[in-house]
């Protein structure tokens, strides 16, 4: 099927690899696995194809980990990302493929850099390769600080809801709820 048009004698290790590096592509997000792994669909060679992508420049908590705290926050972050981009038409800036074959991308929704949104909301660490920061250590320290605040009757963060227009923070101060 089509092989009769290829001169296989000219094919060797120097044949270029498929690359979308530097391209901006309009696509639809069809799946969000976790906070930094998504599937998108976009046209290529006249057909629609699904691509596994990793959001470039960030690291989010893992879903498959022994740390219950990290896993819980991982599902929270995944759900926030789903609320933001699942089934949305976005454009992606493409990089290389990572070691797992995923296309490294920076997704944009209505001009908003989703990687930056993840970082600004505390859902992701910046990540440029190499050793990752420990989500488990970060979350344990954060939980310990909250517990210490409880013991000292200081301000305790009870909840934070952020949407496109509002930020609502509930705190408890010496038994009173302040909104």
Predicted regions mapped to residue ranges:
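Small beta-barrel nucleic-acid-binding modules, primarily SNase/OB-fold domains
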Residues: 1-179
């Amino acid at each position: 099927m089509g092989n009769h048009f290829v001169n296989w004698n000219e094919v060797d290790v120097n044949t270029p690899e498929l690359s979308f590096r530097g391209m901006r592509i309009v696509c639809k997000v069809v799946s969000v696995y976790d906070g930094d792994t998504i599937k998108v669909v976009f046209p290529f060679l006249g057909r629609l194809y699904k691509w596994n992508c990793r959001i470039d420049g960030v690291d989010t908590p893992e879903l498959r980990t022994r740390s219950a705290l990290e896993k819980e926050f991982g599902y929270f972050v995944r759900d926030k990302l789903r609320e933001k981009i699942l089934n949305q038409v976005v454009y992606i800036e493409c990089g290389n493929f990572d070691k797992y074959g995923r296309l490294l991308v920076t997704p944009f929704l209505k001009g908003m850099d989703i990687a930056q949104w993840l970082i600004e909301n505390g859902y992701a660490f910046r990540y440029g390769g190499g050793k990752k920061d420990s989500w488990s250590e970060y979350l344990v320290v954060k939980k310990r600080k909250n517990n210490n605040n409880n013991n000292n009757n200081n301000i305790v963060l009870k909840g934070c809801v952020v949407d496109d227009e509002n930020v609502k923070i509930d705190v408890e101060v010496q038994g009173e709820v302040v909104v």
